[in-house]
Every structure is written in C-alpha cells, then in structure tokens.
Amino acid sequence: MRRKTLFLILITVALLAAGLFLARDAIRTALFDVTGEENLLAQVRGLIDYATNLIRPLPNTADDAVIDEAGGSPFGINTFLEQEVELAKRDRQLQLIAGAGYKWIRQQFPWYDIEIAGKGDFQDCRHANGGPCIDAWAKYDNIVDLAEQHGLEIIARLEAPPKWAQTASGDFAPPANLDDFGDYVAAVAARYKGRLTHYQVWNEPNNYPEWGEQPVNPEGFTRLLCAAYRRIKEVDPNAQVLAPALTPTISLDPGPGPGTGLNDFIFLQRMYEAGAGQCFDIMSAQAYGLFSGPTDRRLRPRSVNFARPLYIRDLMVQNGDARKPIWISEMNWNAVPDEVADKRFGQVSLETQARFLPLAYERVQQEWPWIGVASTWFFKRATDAEKDQAMYYFRLVDPDFTPLPVYDAMKAYTAK
C-alpha cells in the first residue's frame, strides 16, 4: 500500500512537472504580462511584488472621466532639430518621422537661442566673425515651416534662460525677473499664433540641475509657470499650456548637487497647494520603464517603472483635475552597449527595445484613457559626440540617418 501511494505521488509530480515544462512558454508570457520581467527568477520575485498591490490602496485614476484635450494621435517624438545646421537634414528628419507614423514632435525653443545677448535682442551674432548677424528666429521659423509641410504638430518646449536673464548660477537656473520670461513666451506665442498650439513650460524642475545651482523649489516654479500661462493666454487664448514632466525620483534632498532632487509626488502636490492647478491645461509625465518592460503592473511608489504615471494621475484626481489629460513627455528603453559603463537607465538589447516601445503604446491606448500624446525619447542627435553617454542610446536613428530596429518596429506598429 505504501509503495502504491509513493508511486502515485511520483506519477503526480512527474505529470505536474511535464505539464509545467510543456506550458513553460505560456507561463513565462503570463508572468511577463504582469511583471514586465523576462528572466524567470525576476518574474517570480516580480509576482511576489505584484501581490503587494492587493494590500495597499490603488491609485484612483478616474478612468470614466471626460477628458478635455486628448490630442488626437498618441504618437509623438522628441527632436533636437535646432542642433542640425544643414536645412536638408532637418527636412530629412521630419520626413522620416512622418514616415514612421508619428504626428507630433516635442521640440525645444530655448530662450538662450532666441533672445540671445540681451533684452529684446533677437539677433544671433555668435558666429558673425565681423560680418552681419542673422535673425535668431530664422532657425525656428524653418522648423515650424518644415513641420507643417510634413503634417506634424509641435509641442514647443519653453525653457533654458540666457545668461543675461539669470542671477542664480547654473545653465538651467530660472530668470531673476519673471516678467522677462513672460515676455519671451509671449513673443514665441505671438510669432507662431495659429501655427503652434501647444506649449510646455520647463522640464523636470524637481531635479538637479534643472533649477540651477540652488535647491529645487515647487512654489518658486509654480510662480514661473503661472506667469508663463497668463502671458501665453493673453496672446493666444486657444493655446494649450502643458505643465512640465517631473523626474521620477524618490529623493528627498532638494539639493543642489548631483543626484539630488525632490520626489515627484511631493513636488507636484506642493505645486497644487501653491495654485498650479489654475496654470496649465495638460499635465505631463515621464514614462520610463528603466529596468523592466512596459507590461510591469507593480505599483511601487519607491521605485521607478512604467506604471508610475498612475500615481501622477491619482494626485490629479485628488486635486480636482480629473478632466485634464496627461501627455507623456519621454518614453523609451535604453539600448546602451556593454562597453558604456553607465547603466543608470537600465539596459536592453536593440531587439528588446524594438519590442518594448510598441508594447508601451499599446498599453497606453488600451488601459489609460486619460493619456493623450506619448512622445518617444528620442529621434536622433546631430552627431555621435555623446556616444560614450548612456542617454545617447535611446535614439531611433543614428546621426547618419541609419534606422535602428526600434524605428522599423514603430513604423510597422503605427501602420496597423
């Protein structure tokens, strides 16, 4: 009897093992769909983490809310067109972007490159060498013209003060006089009224060095945001103003200094308490997966994964902003090669990057009805001077216009 029982147990274990072996691919796919992890051990750990979702309050995302400004197509991409000296290369960039199915570009209109040498000075004499200066607007007029020709809309990033406007140190320090910043954003909005419709004020002000060599300051930033909002709306009441995306961080050290910053949830709540809710039409967020894929459903406020925008949405709902959408400013995975030491943005293969980015857009469209445009980070850099830096490897296309697998994957996905 004992032998028979032992035999039955062994048969049962063997059948279970065989079943698990035969179903291993389906099991691993199911675990990836929950954890965003591809390694089996990481999937098991991730499943345990996911179980903690059941014992903590889930974000209230108000998925049934009517959203005011969806943006049409969700496909946006970050560009650095101002870095391209040759006009033909700007045109080729936008041709390839439109050809891949993107409908929006997120493009800087940096203050230091427009009102360069002093208040009211829109001439660029930096490379004149004794000859005539050029119109500082010409570059940006060309970018707007080309975007229109290729059927692309622009999210214009308004940021980066010139030295003459700053008293605090640091390239990204805010202006000493908010009226100067207001004049700049009003000048951009007036020049492109009816052609540019969406303006984003600043970028990641909760993180060093995006507020200069001084502690980050949610209340100070809110004053700048509200000043810009008023001036843009005075010029173009129909324009839409985007709040900046905040750096996803758990840091509680406002800085200044490398590695410092203020947690994005705390910074945003303090912005709301300072009155920021009246000073933007669209919220922004970063959606980096970093060390796991786009299907990661673990809700972990003390770590960064693709699900983090759910917490930004929850804060918006708590503060009465359920009708406003979130537009994702930056989204991608880092295909940094082994020889680059910096892996702070995670590391995936070129093939995995090409698989993850379309999956991210799929999740955005299927699960997050309050997301409008989601902008891929990024199309290309003008040169390979930064190829020793991890950030360079988010690109879709090399500086010589060689497309990477992720470009082809997005082109195929948007065509579906």
Ranges and model annotations:
Residues 73-79, 105-107, 154-158, 199-201, ...:
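Hydrophobic faces of well-ordered beta-strands that scaffold small-molecule active sites
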